[in-house]
Amino acid sequence: MDHQDSQRGLLAQWIEESSRIVFFGGAGVSTESGIPDFRGAKGFYHQDREIPLEQVLSIDFFTVHPQAYWEWFVQENAREGVAPNAAHRFVAGLERAGKLSAVVTQNIDGLHQRAGSERVLELHGNWSRLICTGCGERFTLDDVAAARSGEVPHCPACASVLRPDIVFYGEMLDSDVMEGAVRAISEADLLIVAGTSLVVYPAAGLIDYYAGERLVLMNATPTPYDSRADLIIREPVGQVFEELGRRSRRP
């Protein structure tokens, strides 16, 4: 058995022995679904663009230039074939089996829900949901055709500009979501952290609430928390869970 097989085997064993698993995921969970991560070599931050991504995704930029934001949004949502990958499907299966307490995700793509997960805590929101900046009414992308065309969408009720239900740079994370994440992680008997560099706070600091003895870090590059991990896996996230899925189906 090689080192990778040994690591996967240990992770499979820990999953089998656990009943309060929390999966804490970042952008690297969705790269195998066709969505670039942020800080990888091919990530959003390394793409040539006229306006830096952090500026496009700031609340100040959106407030002043909503048209430019929605044009970027349509371009990013034009990616073909984006669908849940093996990681999303495996995690959803853990929830159905009664072994998963929660998914805590930094992603805004909604792929965990599309895979069937229901206990999802979205730290940074979900860009398939819209909120009216005037009356606070909520909509989905399917409710407002303009949001998919690159036009600035307006509220059908009060005509104010609609914004995506995400946490822009310059905004605070939702306190209820953070409290739910802290509670789930503090009660977990296995914490699997995948596809995140753990350098963005306050999200990265959630690991400090984990009191268990089995911390798994699964990321392509080292993280500031590696010294605290009980298992470190340097493989693509979806690839690992695809293999774990095959193992679980074997007689």
Describe every region a protein language model picked out.
Residues 1-251:
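Conserved catalytic core of sirtuin-type NAD+-dependent deacylases
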